[in-house]
Amino acid sequence: MIKILKSIIKRKITDFYETKLGTFYFKQKGYCPCCEEETFFIAKNSWLRDYFKCLVCGSLPRERALMLTIKNEYTNWSNLKIHESSPGERGHSKLLKEKARFYIQTHFYRDKALGTVINGFRNENLESQTFQDETFDLVITADVMEHIYNPAEAFREIHRTLKPGGAHILSVPLVNKHRSTQKWATMNPDGSPNFLYEPDWHGNPIDKQGSPVTFHWGYDIKDFISTCTGDECEIFFIDDLYYGIRAEYIEIIVARKTKDNA
């Protein structure tokens, strides 16, 4: 009887939000892979990719999908040497910082010396890194590779810094899906973007102006990475409401550096 009443109340609340207030409302009970807590996932906007948040930690679906993939593919992740480029302050980045013993965070400050520490972050350009060969077990990039001007060089550099058996695990919005990847912007001599199509910007944790979108990737990113590095690539699509993972552009890519292509 109690369950029936709860179901009725939940339905009435949802109807109220959607019909009376004209507001989308979605709530799901589950477990968050990022804060590792039983929680509710709530969205008040139909664009779940940016609005379906964990009530405890505020993580988003792509962050939960990334962390769940790390846990599923590398169960010993907390003892691995991990490099994350351009981390955020929530979601998988927060958990890795708290529990991964050998975790380093980097940002790219264009006007500062590479390899130096700035505001607690090591300054690294993904296209030209100062790390030694075969340094890391995992390299993590979350919605970063759509902002790189020379992704081929960045993928090669990430491959170089990975140990044999290591992997680059990344989220990137595959907006072109089955269509071919498009270069969206080139870099002007002064470092500003030269957009080839409509200007497109995303948020940047260290720059209020944001980051220009330089590529609209499709599923052919898998072949692009393999061609650049020889890595074995898989694209994972997770749709699991228990973990609060449901949204558009939710794919996670795992590019593994095998001993044969070291």
Residue ranges and their predicted role:
Residues 59-74:
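Short metal-binding segments enriched for Cys and/or His
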Residues 18-27, 149-262:
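S-adenosyl-L-methionine-dependent methyltransferase catalytic module, highlighting the catalytic core
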Residues 38-39, 61, 89:
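Cys/His-rich microdomains that often coordinate metals
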Residues 1-29:
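Membrane-proximal basic amphipathic "stem/tether" segments
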Residues 41-46, 64-67:
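Short Cys/His-rich "knuckle" micro-motifs
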Residues 25-31, 47-51, 78:
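Short metal-coordination and nucleic-acid-contact micro-motifs, chiefly zinc-binding Cys/His arrays
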Residues 32-35, 54-57:
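Short cysteine-rich clusters marking metal-coordination/redox-active sites
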Residues 77-191, 219-222, 253-257:
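Conserved SAM-binding loop
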